């Protein structure tokens, strides 16, 4: 008699692997408080990278478990996997993180089978989880009522958020926060006896900051609320700001930021809480912001297929200068660009395909300091041919035939990245007012400086490789030439040996593969002389090799810079 097919055993092993992953994820996350209290800034960066890498490492480990435990002809019998899915559904029903467990299952399935075997019968293309469930669980938020004064309300808040490192000047902090709150809200709101504060119980940690996150509300309105805390070494914990502007809070949870570390026992509930105070954010971005980037990827994919099914939108080439390495297309009604690697690069590019892939993957694991767009990597996307404008499809097939192929009425995209769509900076400047040009060039220089201080050198700093977000921030998004700043050799141009040297079309000095001459930046970056002069006035130090060498020295000494995800006026 043949043995029954081991669907339940396979499902249990997949879930055991998920438990192991979540345990390691939680261990790294729970260490965030101590790292903050002890000002272990470099450990924070290492922990963030380790937590990002953890998912793929654990998927590979569980893949190995399965292959060792079950014969290939059993494990890889895809016709039986609906039984595994059904068994898995029953196993995860009691969980508080079941949507993450579904995504984990999908990752294991894709690690075992080719993508052309993907179906909703075998996988969770559509979630089986209800978006909100009424369950008995510990409260994830605390509520504070106006008790006589704003100062008393704030004092009650901070009494519930102690640290092993004491607050340096709590009464001074409370006075400043009360003043900022009165500036942010109308006077009648501050005096409204119905005014209350609701805060998420766990503190959110990222880089050098800790964040209290929640909302202010009365019987009629609500406002998001974020209170960033800093550890001033030698001075204790300090409340750095109070932020109630939705756009400012949205930037804190931006796709350009590193992921928060927060103890989130019920991820869906926390994401729904954030969604209520930031209705403009997609849940994919909110999941990603707290470190569940694979769940963010799942939610993004579901939103994409729903958009394609419910609209007449068709893929078109993205506006802007065509890339020398990547080809970029988009859906006009979907705020995302899709990037594929061309088969042949422009002659001026010295990178190869493998290097480009490594560069894009690097971006996910480094501190993006609010200046680099996060990416999601996909394999074997399949779309109906009818969803492409003919000229877009023709261009993709021409420049990347090894990546884009036709399978009857289906377009197969073997490999791509997605990024948030932005307005290319060069196009933005063409339409900008004088004031907007000033703000954009100021922020462009700040973006370069902040990336550099985080040990990232963009390489190709042309305006077309930066975008402007809906909040007016300048963000870098073309990664094929990025490197660590400490790998670059910044040099002054040597003086000419003879008068004829300056007239020559060739340099009179040797140039190594990692050499960069900042004095050459002005004509390289700006054809417009007015913009060139303005940028020189705003950020002229970027043209000096000594400025870059000073940053390199600070990085080598182990200094970790402060880059705040909120504007100066909020502090």
Curated annotation (Swiss-Prot):
<keyword id="KW-0808">Transferase</keyword>
<dbReference type="GO" id="GO:0016208">
    <property type="term" value="F:AMP binding"/>
</dbReference>
<dbReference type="InterPro" id="IPR010452">
    <property type="entry name" value="Isocitrate_DH_AceK"/>
</dbReference>
<comment type="similarity">
    <text>Belongs to the AceK family.</text>
</comment>
<dbReference type="GO" id="GO:0008772">
    <property type="term" value="F:[isocitrate dehydrogenase (NADP+)] kinase activity"/>
</dbReference>
<dbReference type="Pfam" id="PF06315">
    <property type="entry name" value="AceK_kinase"/>
</dbReference>
<keyword id="KW-0816">Tricarboxylic acid cycle</keyword>
<feature type="active site">
    <location>
        <position position="374"/>
    </location>
</feature>
<keyword id="KW-0547">Nucleotide-binding</keyword>
<comment type="function">
    <text>Bifunctional enzyme which can phosphorylate or dephosphorylate isocitrate dehydrogenase (IDH) on a specific serine residue. This is a regulatory mechanism which enables bacteria to bypass the Krebs cycle via the glyoxylate shunt in response to the source of carbon. When bacteria are grown on glucose, IDH is fully active and unphosphorylated, but when grown on acetate or ethanol, the activity of IDH declines drastically concomitant with its phosphorylation.</text>
</comment>
<dbReference type="GO" id="GO:0006006">
    <property type="term" value="P:glucose metabolic process"/>
</dbReference>
<protein>
    <recommendedName>
        <fullName>Isocitrate dehydrogenase kinase/phosphatase</fullName>
        <ecNumber>2.7.11.5</ecNumber>
        <ecNumber>3.1.3.-</ecNumber>
    </recommendedName>
</protein>
<dbReference type="GO" id="GO:0005524">
    <property type="term" value="F:ATP binding"/>
</dbReference>
<dbReference type="GO" id="GO:0004721">
    <property type="term" value="F:phosphoprotein phosphatase activity"/>
</dbReference>
<keyword id="KW-0723">Serine/threonine-protein kinase</keyword>
<dbReference type="Pfam" id="PF20423">
    <property type="entry name" value="AceK_regulatory"/>
</dbReference>
<dbReference type="InterPro" id="IPR046854">
    <property type="entry name" value="AceK_regulatory"/>
</dbReference>
<dbReference type="GO" id="GO:0006099">
    <property type="term" value="P:tricarboxylic acid cycle"/>
</dbReference>
<dbReference type="GO" id="GO:0004674">
    <property type="term" value="F:protein serine/threonine kinase activity"/>
</dbReference>
<keyword id="KW-0378">Hydrolase</keyword>
<keyword id="KW-0963">Cytoplasm</keyword>
<dbReference type="GO" id="GO:0005737">
    <property type="term" value="C:cytoplasm"/>
</dbReference>
<keyword id="KW-0418">Kinase</keyword>
<keyword id="KW-0904">Protein phosphatase</keyword>
<keyword id="KW-0329">Glyoxylate bypass</keyword>
<dbReference type="InterPro" id="IPR046855">
    <property type="entry name" value="AceK_kinase"/>
</dbReference>
<feature type="binding site">
    <location>
        <begin position="318"/>
        <end position="324"/>
    </location>
    <ligand>
        <name>ATP</name>
    </ligand>
</feature>
<keyword id="KW-0067">ATP-binding</keyword>
<feature type="binding site">
    <location>
        <position position="339"/>
    </location>
    <ligand>
        <name>ATP</name>
    </ligand>
</feature>
<dbReference type="GO" id="GO:0006097">
    <property type="term" value="P:glyoxylate cycle"/>
</dbReference>
């Amino acid at each position: 008699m043949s043995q029954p097919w081991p669907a339940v055993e396979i499902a249990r092993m997949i879930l055991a692997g998920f438990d192991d992953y979540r345990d390691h994820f939680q261990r790294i996350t729970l260490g965030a408080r101590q790292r903050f209290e002890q000002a272990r800034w470099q450990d924070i960066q290492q922990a963030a990278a380790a937590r990002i890498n953890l998912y793929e490492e654990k998927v590979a480990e569980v893949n190995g478990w399965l292959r060792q435990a079950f014969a290939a002809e059993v494990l890889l019998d895809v016709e039986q996997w609906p039984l595994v899915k059904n068994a898995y559904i029953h196993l995860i029903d009691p969980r508080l993180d079941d949507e993450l467990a579904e995504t984990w299952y999908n990752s294991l399935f894709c690690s075992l089978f080719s993508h052309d075997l993907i179906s909703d019968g075998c996988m969770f293309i559509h979630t089986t989880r209800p978006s909100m469930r009424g369950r008995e669980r510990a409260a994830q938020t605390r509520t504070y009522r106006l008790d006589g004064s704003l100062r008393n309300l704030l004092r009650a808040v901070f009494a519930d958020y102690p640290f092993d490192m004491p607050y340096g000047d709590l009464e001074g902090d409370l006075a400043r926060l009360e003043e900022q709150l009165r500036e942010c809200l109308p006077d009648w709101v501050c005096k409204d006896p119905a005014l209350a504060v609701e805060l998420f119980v766990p503190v959110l940690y990222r880089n050098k900051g800790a964040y209290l996150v929640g909302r202010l509300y009365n019987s009629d309105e609500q406002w998001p609320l974020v209170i960033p805390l800093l550890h001033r070494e030698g001075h204790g914990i300090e409340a750095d700001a109070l932020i109630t502007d939705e756009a400012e809070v949205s930037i804190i949870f931006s796709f350009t930021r590193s992921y928060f570390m927060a103890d989130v026992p019920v991820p869906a509930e926390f994401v729904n809480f954030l969604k209520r105070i930031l209705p403009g954010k997609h849940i994919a971005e909110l999941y990603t912001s707290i470190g569940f980037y694979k769940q963010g990827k799942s939610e993004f994919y579901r939103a994409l297929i729903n958009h394609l099914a419910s609209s007449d939108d068709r893929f078109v080439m993205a506006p802007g200068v065509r890339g020398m390495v990547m080809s970029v297309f988009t859906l006009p009604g979907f705020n995302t660009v899709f990037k594929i690697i061309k088969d042949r690069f422009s002659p001026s590019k010295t990178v190869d395909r493998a290097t480009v892939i490594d560069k894009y993957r690097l971006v996910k694991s480094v501190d993006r300091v609010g200046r680099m767009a996060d990416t999601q990597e996909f394999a074997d996307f399949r779309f109906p041919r009818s969803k492409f404008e003919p000229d877009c499809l023709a261009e993709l097939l021409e420049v990347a035939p090894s990546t884009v192929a036709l399978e009857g009425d289906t377009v197969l995209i073997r490999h791509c990245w997605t990024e948030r769509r932005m307005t290319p900076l060069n196009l933005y400047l063409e339409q900008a007012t004088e004031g907007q040009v000033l703000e954009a060039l100021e922020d462009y220089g700040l973006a370069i400086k902040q990336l550099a201080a985080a040990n990232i050198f963009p390489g190709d700093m042309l305006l077309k490789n930066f975008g402007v977000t809906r909040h007016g921030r300048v963000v870098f998004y073309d990664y094929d030439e990025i490197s660590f700043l400490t790998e670059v050799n910044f040099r002054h141009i040597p003086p000419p040996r003879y008068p004829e040297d300056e007239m020559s079309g060739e340099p009179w000095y040797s140039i190594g593969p990692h050499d960069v001459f900042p004095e050459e930046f002005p004509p390289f970056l700006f054809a417009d002389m007015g913009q060139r002069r303005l940028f020189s006035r705003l950020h002229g130090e970027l043209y000096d090799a000594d400025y870059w060498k000073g940053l390199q020295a600070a990085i080598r000494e182990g200094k970790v810079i402060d880059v705040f995800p909120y504007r100066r006026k909020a502090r």
